[in-house]
Amino acid sequence: MKCFDFDESVQKVLNDSFSDIEPTNWKSWLEISSSEEFEELCLKNSGLSSVNEIFKRATSEITDSRSFSINLEKFLSNYSQSYTPIVCHTSGTTNSKISALKWFFMSKSVIQRNWAPGMQAIFESSGLDSKSSAVIFVPSRVKLDGLQYYEEQPFISLYSSEFSQRVMLSIIKPKAYTFYEYKNSKHLDVISKIFDLDDIMVISAPALTILGWADLEKLTLQIQKSLEDLPNYKNPILENLISMIKKEGIQKASKIIQEKLSEKLSKATIIFSISSLSEQNWNLIRRFMKWEKGKERFTNLYVASEIGPFASSISKGDFEISRQNRLYVFPLTLAAIEHHNKKQLISRASNKTGKLLVSRMDGSEALINIDLGDIISIKENKGLPQIDGKIIRSSFKLKYDLKFSDKFTIPFDYNIYAGDFFSLNDFIINQPRNLINCLKNDCNLEVDALLLLKSNKQSWDLVFPSNIHENCLKEKKIIELISSCLHQEELTQGIINNLINIAFIDDQPVDFLATRSEILNKVREGQAPKGILKKWPLYVIIPKNDENTLI
């Protein structure tokens, strides 16, 4: 296997531990024809078939993921198994401190039952096999990641996104691959490694990486910057690229490199999430990948640190389910949804939208209804269930501070909530990003986050910046936009009935304490987890003495 890997030592440990895992016949999942068959396979694959009254428990119990997370130091001091332990950590969405991350032990049984089959299905359905190559990019590591030592004993720590793809490499064993961090995707040395691969069938990278290649200005800037940071040993391809830049100049050479990269990757399938892609960005990606509209080749996926690969738009090659933005639920765990405190298995659910709860085994212990904090929508639950590819985050309490405008008054003692879905006593707010997009399109508003403030026991303030088109500086217009963009009658009526006051201020309502570039540098240097980069569309402030407002 030809590999260009920024950490081959970690991959070697995973290969030694997991390369003998038997492959799964994931194509048979697509032949599942009934809910009963799906449930039976879920119980068999997950190991939950041995759990008494599993269906009853799956409609009544719930598990906080922190209850089975590990104290890293305590776990390592007591570890006694013969193989190198591997731990994965969360992305730090709720807390910006590395010390606050949740850690999970990746036991061999969990990898065999959940991670290996799911990742094999995702990549093989995208076209990767032992005769083809893969281009893979992963998040910048935190400072604790990689092959580490505790009291002279080795252990491996990784984001689940890096771990999952390294497990996949151990199982599928492609003939060649590149494996680097997102931040180096436009580095000339990394590009030269991609040029050294043949038969590239899969690119696993976020949309921003592809867009970075597709944007010639950004690509040129980063290629030029990377010339100051080239390795001492330069492979022949890299030497040729450097010579071309010297001869043609950076602008012309970057254009040639972009065209070669586009051609090199044009037969590949991209594995990425498409939820946040605008049509403009889609067009950039189509042009770079040489795709016709309606003939895009990509695979969407949903993987969580607590449970592994849960769903993906796997297929037998037509990618139609991907283009519909749907995902098949893998029969590797037992999943339920919770709607208004009622829990139902997704294979039996009458309610089609709710909070995702997933049951799996952890060694000999059954973890029933792990609360992942995400909201899913079921599109089909006869046979192999299908869910909407847009997974939204239920509201959660932030554990780091933000900067609020001094143009309004906030409570003395309060909590901050963020997310995509807020269930409040008097109304629900679902996908507020849609409202921001409408404000940008209809009102020329330059804002990426709004603020909802509980101003007193009876009412709220929904705060907007006033640097918008004058036609939008009216409550009536805001009501129209909320009605047309969010389709949430309770919220609209709340404004009409003065439960929610519309407030305009000559300032941005909310922002990070540091600049975006400062935070990004911290993440890239491993000083902060990547979750801190997420700017949520809505932040909600609730006084601590009024916490029962959020349900």
What are the residue ranges of the model-derived segments?
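Conserved helicase ATPase motor motifs in RecA-like P-loop NTPase domains
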Residues: V87-T94, S276
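Short loop/turn segments at strand-loop or loop-helix junctions that form parts
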Residues: H89-G92, F137-R141, I203-L208, S466
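Conserved ATP-dependent adenylate/AMP-binding module captured primarily in the ANL superfamily
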Residues: Q112-S132, S185-D198
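Short beta-strand->loop structural element characteristic of the AMP-binding/adenylate-forming
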Residues: A100-K102, S157-L158, E162-N184
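Active-site diphosphate/adenylate-binding microenvironment
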Residues: I21-V87, I98-F105, N114-L128, K143-L144
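Conserved AMP-binding loop of ANL adenylate-forming enzymes
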Residues: G118-R166
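"Short basic amphipathic alpha-helical interaction patches in structured regions
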Residues: L101-S109, N114-P117, Y149-E152, K218, ...
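Active-site glycine/GP-rich loop and adjacent strand/helix microenvironment
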Residues: K2-F18, S170-I551
